Amino acid sequence: MEPLMGMGVLALMGAAATIAGTTEDLESDVGSQSNPNSQVQLAPQMMYPHRIYNKAISGEPPSNALICAIGGTVASVLMTANLSVIFAIAIGALVASAVHGTYCITAYMGRTASQKRFRQPIYLDILRSHTPVMMGYAFITTFCILVVSYIMVAVLAHPFPLTLLAFIWGITVGAIGSSTGDVHYGAEREFQNVEFGSGLNAANSGNIVRKAESGLRNGIDNSWFCAKFGGPVTGLAFGMTVFLSGWVTAVFNPAISLTMGWLSVAAGVILVLLLIIWNRKIEVAARKAFGPYKEEEEVAA
């Protein structure tokens, strides 16, 4: 493949991955399927009932791996039957989103019903309004992951089958969403009533923000907030992962010669080192900008 064509293919994959990462994070924010879900689950036990959709089917990586693998399996079967690629991928994503919606409903009903002793109600309006939103986000995520996987198989001649690639990318996008976007949801949304940078005192466990800008807060309110930063950052992280992982071999194609293969390895190592240094500089700059915690200042005084 020509280098220019290869870069175009990588750009398309990066764009699809960016969308997938964004929708994956926002889906987890609507249903609170993320690391901060522990506080959503704990809140009724601490006598803080709420209207936040509490599903947490599993961790985000296995959950997204499941729906992407289901979508990839259905799409592969349909393409084997000579169905159009676009229709096969769309139908695969639709089936995956339906399965995901089923898990959402059973998880919400089961987890909330188990908290009856803590007087946590099951809100049927929350179930009806939030589940279609999560299914829509899951459809977009699965569709984009299948697009990336199909391009790798059909255009880049990757040796792995479509379903396995979709499974791997599903784990990846779930892991990135769990480590990137969840910080915004947990620290900046669930505990907006706590001073920034102060950490979570044990006395505040479960005391999440339950009142919204208007009325009581729900999962869609959280998704609206996280769409401003957490979702796009997750999409950017996943898009960069997909694009940069293929960029080094597109520029230094190992198929040309052994030297180019080693150059691609060196370029990858240099790229990782640059990202580590950049991340460290951002962290140091943030700490200098916000300063030390007040408790540390008082102890020093």
From Swiss-Prot:
GO cellular-component term (any): plasma membrane
Lipid bilayer topology: Multi-pass membrane protein
GO molecular function: tetrahydromethanopterin S-methyltransferase activity
Catalytic activity, as annotated: 5-methyl-5,6,7,8-tetrahydromethanopterin + coenzyme M + 2 Na(+)(in) = 5,6,7,8-tetrahydromethanopterin + methyl-coenzyme M + 2 Na(+)(out)
One Pfam family in the UniProt entry: MtrE
Keywords: Cell membrane, Membrane, Methyltransferase, One-carbon metabolism, Transferase, Translocase, Transmembrane, Transmembrane helix
Coarse class of the protein's main subcellular location: membrane
Positions of disulphide bridges: none
Domain of life (superkingdom): Archaea
Chain ranges passing through the membrane: 85-105, 130-150, 151-171, 232-252, 258-278
Localization per record: Cell membrane
Catalytic EC class: translocase
GO biological process: methanogenesis, from carbon dioxide; methylation; one-carbon metabolic process
Enzyme Commission designation: 7.2.1.4
Family statement drawn from the similarity comment of this UniProt entry: Belongs to the MtrE family.
Quaternary structure note: The complex is composed of 8 subunits; MtrA, MtrB, MtrC, MtrD, MtrE, MtrF, MtrG and MtrH.
Task of the protein: Part of a complex that catalyzes the formation of methyl-coenzyme M and tetrahydromethanopterin from coenzyme M and methyl-tetrahydromethanopterin. This is an energy-conserving, sodium-ion translocating step.
Name this polypeptide is given: Tetrahydromethanopterin S-methyltransferase subunit E
Organism: Methanococcoides burtonii (strain DSM 6242 / NBRC 107633 / OCM 468 / ACE-M)
